[in-house]
């Protein structure tokens, strides 16, 4: 509501869409009708940003995306030096944008959360598999801890020492082994 009021004080039209479950922002963003001059401002954290980008990419939207940090970790906001809501809105209103590379991840059927078929996701921040996912799943069960839950989650995942047999293909070269973690970071 604070962000909406700040935009409206600048005479900027705002349409709000709220999510109620994980993955809903993908659907909401994919269903938006946008043009090149529109900005979709994401009020949330890294997960919300990734969902909105995925939905916009599915819709082949050419609009810009702004991030207003309101998540727990806010890794991307920290990388972009977005201190608070006011800073983020100021950059959006003045057109102060940073071009970012996106990672496109095509996941095969059978992965947790993707048992029924292939799935494509996009990320501007990071993509992780294995330990990173394990720690996030554990952290999500401890939301009451705030940002510290990520530290506790990673410690628990390290202690569990889960390794997975997989084939990673990089530049056409397959690497088959037991892995603890894959991580692609954009910062």
Which residue ranges define each predicted feature?
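ATP/NTP phosphate-donor binding region
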Residues: 1-40, 50, 54-55, 87
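Short glycine/serine/threonine-rich phosphate/pyrophosphate-binding segments
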Residues: 25, 47-52, 75, 100
């Amino acid at each position: 509501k604070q962000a909406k009021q700040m935009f409206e004080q600048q005479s900027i039209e705002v349409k709000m869409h709220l999510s109620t479950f994980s993955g809903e922002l993908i659907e909401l963003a994919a269903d938006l009708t946008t043009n090149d001059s529109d900005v979709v401002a994401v009020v949330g954290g890294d997960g919300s940003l990734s969902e909105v980008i995925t939905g916009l990419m599915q819709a082949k939207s050419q609009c810009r995306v702004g991030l207003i940090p309101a998540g727990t970790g806010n890794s991307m906001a920290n990388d972009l030096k977005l201190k608070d809501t006011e800073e983020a809105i100021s950059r959006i209103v003045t057109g102060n944008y940073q071009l970012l590379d996106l990672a496109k991840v095509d996941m095969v059927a059978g992965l947790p959360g993707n048992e029924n078929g292939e799935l494509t996701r996009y990320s501007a921040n990071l993509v992780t598999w294995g330990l990173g996912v394990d720690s996030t799943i554990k952290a999500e069960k401890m939301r009451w801890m705030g940002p510290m839950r990520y530290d506790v989650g990673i410690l628990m995942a390290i202690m569990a020492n889960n390794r997975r047999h997989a084939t990673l293909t990089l530049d056409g070269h397959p690497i088959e082994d037991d892995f603890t973690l894959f991580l692609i970071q954009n910062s």
